Amino acid sequence: MKTCAIIPVSRFTHAKTRLSPTLSPSEREGLLKAMLMDVSGALARHVDRVLVISADEDVLEYAYSLGLKILEEEGERDLNGALEQAMDFCAPEFDRVIITPSDIPLIGKADVSNLLDHASRADVVIAPANGGGTNTLILRPSAMSLRFGDCSFFEHIHEARERGLSVSVYDSFYLSLDVNTAEDLGEIILHGEGTHAREYLRKLRFTVKPSRGSDRLEVSRSP
């Protein structure tokens, strides 16, 4: 069964603004590039093609430099609209797609081959994100409408069942972690050995230790 991985990527200059107290704009861009290397590299070992869709020429140029297939968004689309465009692009050639964000750098720690095996036993495979989102979705192109956004995990399950599709939930810590906060950076440092993202954060002199405050982890930066 031919499989295409679809990775939507926001503009480098607009992404991860919640990390602005911790990382400068250029550092956030560097982290985004490192995470895209991790995600695309982990998927490329198990699928027939990795496709990056973006409205940002800089993103597309960088993805192309990594040897990835690129697709420019048509017009002003939201995330679901961009992904629908990407699925339509894949439909003539591929039997299924695996959709992942570009900010789950620990995906290589998960068993991607086992994740894809689940797709042979169900019409739709969903890996939840922390907070009720969706961090991985496997399905036939255009099998159902996409509902990425707040609480999309539950909306995708509902949408699939409304279409009469069988659903398999793949629960994985490594797939659930998307990067939005300084504490998430700490999780990468703790669990991301061998990833480009961890190496990048180490170069920026970030360290992590257990926190005695409200957060589980205390992430700091050496001078």
From Swiss-Prot:
Pathway: Cofactor biosynthesis; coenzyme F420 biosynthesis. GO terms for molecular function: GTP binding; phospholactate guanylyltransferase activity. It catalyses: (2S)-2-phospholactate + GTP + H(+) = (2S)-lactyl-2-diphospho-5'-guanosine + diphosphate. Its EC number is 2.7.7.68. It is an enzyme of class 2 (transferase). It holds the Pfam family CofC. Keywords: GTP-binding, Nucleotide-binding, Nucleotidyltransferase, Transferase. GO terms for biological process: F420-0 metabolic process. Belongs to the CofC family. PANTHER family: 2-PHOSPHO-L-LACTATE GUANYLYLTRANSFERASE. Homodimer. HAMAP family: CofC (MF_02114). Guanylyltransferase that catalyzes the activation of (2S)-2-phospholactate (2-PL) as (2S)-lactyl-2-diphospho-5'-guanosine, via the condensation of 2-PL with GTP. It is involved in the biosynthesis of coenzyme F420, a hydride carrier cofactor. NCBIfam families: F420_cofC (TIGR03552). This is 2-phospho-L-lactate guanylyltransferase.
